[in-house]
């Protein structure tokens, strides 16, 4: 039974990732006054299938000077972590119900740094290594902000369990009372997933393609799938943390539909931002975090710690 549940959990994510690539290309096309993919299948709907077949049937090439084991392990690790991060998410039911679900997600997002670093190091290429170092510095930096924002949310929630967030937000979404945190969280997730305008790892003018420049065929497709799975997972997290999930014990299907619509809207915002904004300069990216976001999140965290004490009350669910 567990194997069936696992398959029912993995296959929809892979399908969602495949069609997200199509949606992105279509959206960018219409925003630039063109059609996007429209040849393969009706309205281009079979384009992700064609892309997948093409990538996984090509010969996986690698540089002669690369470190073979690490070169192969890096994309497998990236895809595995991108799939595992979904396990504690309540949609509204989880695959594995963890008491420390938020810490689990935070630790997995930290581990994803290793796959990027290994890929850049194992490629034995200057472009790949510089792209990997950029990605690692960016990801580790923004994880500081994400961790403090999560701590603030947990102080309001009174628990590290994700399911309790659904109960906390029964009357009002947390985005109403904590909109500065929600804004900084959303911008930080853009940086965490290396998306525009923070896609400094893929600066075409100076780094060709970033840390995955030496990858082709299957291993490249794994990195691609991992990136888009992380995008959907981060938006699912945003929906759970700040937009609730409209928990309805009688009609769980409605809860799932509500969660899906919120995640779809947030993911569409990712694509809209990509079409609208130019790439940041690297020093501006770091300045935004260390000089703006970090002091603000620390101040707000202290605020949420002091409010219950000042009002002589305790958070719910303790």
Swiss-Prot record:
GO CC term, one of those recorded? mitochondrial inner membrane
Superkingdom of this protein's organism: Eukaryota
Q: Where does it mainly reside?
A: mitochondrion
Instruction: Fetch the InterPro entries from UniProt.
Output: NADH_UbQ_OxRdtase_su1/FPO (IPR001694), NADH_UbQ_OxRdtase_su1_CS (IPR018086)
A GO term, aspect molecular function: NADH dehydrogenase (ubiquinone) activity
Which compartments is it annotated to reside in? Mitochondrion inner membrane
Stretches that traverse the bilayer: 2-22, 70-90, 100-120, 136-156, 172-192, 223-243, 253-273, 294-314
Pfam families assigned to the protein according to its UniProt record, in alphabetical order: NADHdh
Q: Biological process (GO) annotations?
A: mitochondrial electron transport, NADH to ubiquinone; mitochondrial respiratory chain complex I assembly
Q: Which transformation does this protein catalyse, written as a reaction?
A: a ubiquinone + NADH + 5 H(+)(in) = a ubiquinol + NAD(+) + 4 H(+)(out)
Topological category with respect to the lipid bilayer = Multi-pass membrane protein
Q: Which UniProt keywords apply?
A: Electron transport, Membrane, Mitochondrion, Mitochondrion inner membrane, NAD, Respiratory chain, Translocase, Transmembrane, Transmembrane helix, Transport, Ubiquinone
Record-listed E.C. numbers: 7.1.1.2
Family to which this protein belongs: Belongs to the complex I subunit 1 family.
Subunit text: Core subunit of respiratory chain NADH dehydrogenase (Complex I) which is composed of 45 different subunits.
Protein role: Core subunit of the mitochondrial membrane respiratory chain NADH dehydrogenase (Complex I) which catalyzes electron transfer from NADH through the respiratory chain, using ubiquinone as an electron acceptor. Essential for the catalytic activity and assembly of complex I.
- Designated name of the protein: NADH-ubiquinone oxidoreductase chain 1
Q: Which organism is it from?
A: Notamacropus eugenii (Tammar wallaby)
């Amino acid at each position: 039974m567990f194997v069936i549940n696992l398959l029912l959990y993995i296959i929809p994510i892979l399908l969602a990732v495949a069609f997200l690539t199509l949606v992105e290309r279509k959206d960018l096309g219409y925003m630039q006054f063109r059609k996007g993919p429209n040849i393969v299948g009706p309205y281009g709907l079979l384009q992700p299938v064609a892309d997948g077949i093409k990538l996984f049937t090509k010969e996986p090439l690698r540089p002669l000077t690369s470190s073979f084991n690490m070169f192969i392990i890096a994309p497998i690790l990236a895809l595995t972590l991108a799939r595992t991060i979904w396990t504690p998410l309540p949609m509204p039911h989880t695959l594995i119900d963890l008491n420390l679900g938020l810490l689990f997600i935070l630790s997995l997002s930290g581990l994803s740094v290793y796959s990027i670093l290994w890929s850049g190091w194992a490629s034995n290429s200057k472009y790949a290594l510089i792209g990997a170092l950029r990605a690692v510095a960016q990801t580790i930096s923004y994880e500081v902000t994400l961790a403090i924002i999560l701590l603030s949310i947990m102080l309001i929630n009174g628990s590290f369990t994700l399911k309790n967030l659904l109960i906390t937000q029964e009357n009002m979404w947390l985005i109403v009372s904590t909109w500065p945190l929600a804004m900084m969280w959303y911008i930080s997730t853009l940086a965490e997933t290396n998306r525009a305008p923070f896609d400094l790892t893929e600066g075409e003018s100076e780094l060709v393609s970033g840390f995955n420049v030496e990858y082709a065929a299957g291993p490249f497709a794994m990195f691609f799938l991992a990136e888009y799975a992380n995008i959907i997972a981060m938006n699912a997290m945003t929906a759970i943390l700040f937009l609730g999930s409209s928990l309805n014990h009688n009609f769980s299907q409605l809860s799932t539909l509500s969660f899906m619509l919120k995640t779809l809207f947030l993911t569409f915002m990712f694509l809209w931002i990509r079409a609208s904004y130019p790439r940041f300069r690297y020093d501006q990216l770091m300045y935004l975090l260390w000089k703006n976001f970090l002091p603000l999140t620390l101040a707000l965290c202290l605020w949420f710690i002091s409010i219950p004490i000042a009002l002589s009350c305790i958070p719910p669910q303790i």
